[in-house]
């Protein structure tokens, strides 16, 4: 069964329409680390709340392509190109 109940709000549309501006902004410093650094050879672990933020969406650049990770109302994660 496919869950198409995506989080859609004005903030989401702002992010999509201004994605280039968002990606080209200079990074800002934050006193809180996004995640604990990996210990030894363990992979990095990041909570979905930290990754998606208040808008419930994150843009991921992978090999020059932009992907969108978002959370559905049912709490599932959807990754689209």
Curated annotation (Swiss-Prot):
GO terms, biological process: iron ion transport
Family according to the record: To E.coli YdiE.
Organism: Yersinia enterocolitica
GN (gene name): hemP
Function: This protein is involved in the uptake of hemin.
Descriptive protein name: Hemin uptake protein HemP
Region described as Disordered: spans on this chain: 26-46
Keywords: Ion transport, Iron, Iron transport, Transport
InterPro entries in UniProt: Hemin_uptake_protein_HemP
Superkingdom assignment: Bacteria
